[in-house]
Amino acid sequence: MIRRRPLLALPFALPFASVALPGCGDQGKASEDAAFDAVDLAKEIVARDVEQVRKGMPEGVKVLQKRMPSDPLGSRLELQTAIKAARENTDSLQIAKSTFFSFATPDGLVLRSEIDPDRLVDQNILKAFPGLAKALEPNAGLVEAYGQLEALRGVRKGDDLAWVVAHAVPAKEGDKPAGLFLSGWSFRLYARVMQEGVRQKLIERTKTSEKKEIPVVYPYFLKSGGAYGDPDAPDVNAEQLVKLEAGSKAQSADFRTHIEIEKRTFGIAAKKEPLFGDDSAIAVVASVF
């Protein structure tokens, strides 16, 4: 699980401003290739981490149902302990990169989350994500939604988007659900996991390769016209991805180009990512020095 922590600058984050150019020679091609390759690495990481959540939530519900207090509204500390047990006793959720695990009543009121401070408590998740109400229907299984809620933001400023996964928790008695088990992540906070994962894979490659240079890489989620990267990534990266319409262009074919930024060349690549719907893609802004 991703723990909230101070948003410290990464050693390879460089501030810059962008201007799109038609071509920048060999360095442009090399940076494009690096970005294109890094997209595949990012997609591998995302596929692994999404599977952990989707596989783990139904199993976690079984643990949560057993540990739930009879009066969750009046026993919120006990409920928090049950939520923690659901994650810790489910193999996939133990290592999931979620930024929250929470429980909500059938009408959407979040009673407790696993970690403190609990920014989501007493928020109505169904008002922010009405589509999650489908999870309360018989045999609905997992239901997912995307949107914005201040309590789920992973950054103090700038755009963010949340991925929320819900699964009904059966009541110990009766047919109606006791509530919803919730998880998911802030795309901005998860982008940090994706970025660090891609960089680590590139470092590992240098151990068995003659090429020891590691490109600068900034992975992004692209969805619904927005671009969501590591909180410390330069804002201009996301602005450029939106300006280039990289997300929409990647839906029909893999997208790649390069731009010059303060006399340095950066490659951009994007590929669609159906794990998050038809309007989603993974992009990387990269530079080979």
Locations of regions flagged by a protein language model:
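N-terminal export leaders
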Residues: 4-8
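Bacterial N-terminal signal peptides
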Residues: 11-19
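Juxtamembrane extracytoplasmic/periplasmic/luminal helical "stalk" adjacent to the first N-terminal
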Residues: 24-77, 95, 160-165, 177, ...
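Conserved beta-strands of PAS-like sensory domains
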Residues: 80, 158-202, 269-271, 278-289
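Solvent-exposed, extracytoplasmic
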Residues: 80-95, 173, 180-229
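Extracellular/periplasmic ligand-sensing ectodomains of membrane signal-transduction proteins
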Residues: 89-140, 154-155, 224-243
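Extracytoplasmic/periplasmic ligand-binding sensor regions of membrane-associated signaling proteins
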Residues: 113-183, 258-262
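Extracellular/periplasmic juxtamembrane segments that couple receptor/chemosensory ectodomains to their
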Residues: 234-289
